[in-house]
């Protein structure tokens, strides 16, 4: 298969700004060494055939040794009909066509080191890989533009179906590295040029997430609360956190919406402290871990997206030397991570596996 084109892109951890990208706020994300890969081979017909690692392989550290794949066929000469509102492979093809890209037939074989449905942006990373693979396949210059790839991926995964997600996952995967993403005026990415000497340790709770319902339960009441507060001149979470708006106005909300809005205000303040910290020199590990865990506590207590299993993992890790940690992704299950001294990593893993 000498004419095959290979592409890959990483998953990410969200350090700060979880559940805030869809509010038009900032996030800090870091790419990790779990990747989605695609191998693209041209065909002589109008069929795009995607073979993707079987969704049964949905846990960390499971290799596709038996070659288990699911296959999806799309004839681009015909109208594309979605099987569901999560038919992201066909929506990616359809969005590219609607944007005017001249696609042709391809075989695309996809593999992933990323567990599916666990808060590791597997669907976003997959869509980014498909977009890049198809653009590379047709030799389009946009294949070299990570911003363009990320926007197309967002349109295919979120906008096409009216889903409630934000843009962090697509941009973090397409751009990679340690980055501060801002969404207030379009999308801006600011690389953070520093190394982090500690170890990020990722854990799978083995609990399957219901991403759309979790997002709806956290995003919708926050937006509803902010809409109510507009009547009092409040322009958004950033206005309440740093812009001079009277925070006591939040008391005009019912308890449910009030709790969501207050958690987002505090998490925005934590994000700003985190960005300032990451741009400092010197040893920041302990303070960084504490801020990450403070962020998690707002996600747990304010947005209600943690689980008993994830709390048990984080408690055990911190008791055995981790600086801090948090749930990763939309929540309600899936993965969490801790930031820890490298010399403590093995012990932390051993103790959690005991439980």
List where the protein language model places each region:
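Gly/Ser-rich oxyanion-binding loop with an adjacent helix/lid
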Residues: 1-13, 21-22, 82-194, 319, ...
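Glycine-rich phosphate-binding loops that contact phosphosugars or nucleotide phosphates
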Residues: 333
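A generic structural signal for short coil/turn motifs at secondary-structure boundaries
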Residues: 24-26, 116-120, 209-213, 300-301
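FabD-like malonyl-/acyl-CoA
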Residues: 125, 336-339
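C-terminal nucleotide
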Residues: 2-16, 37-86, 95-98, 102, ...
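Structural signature of FAD isoalloxazine-binding scaffolds in flavoprotein oxidoreductases
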Residues: 24-44
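Short acidic-hydrophobic sequence patches enriched in Asp/Glu that either
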Residues: 30, 126, 145-149, 163, ...
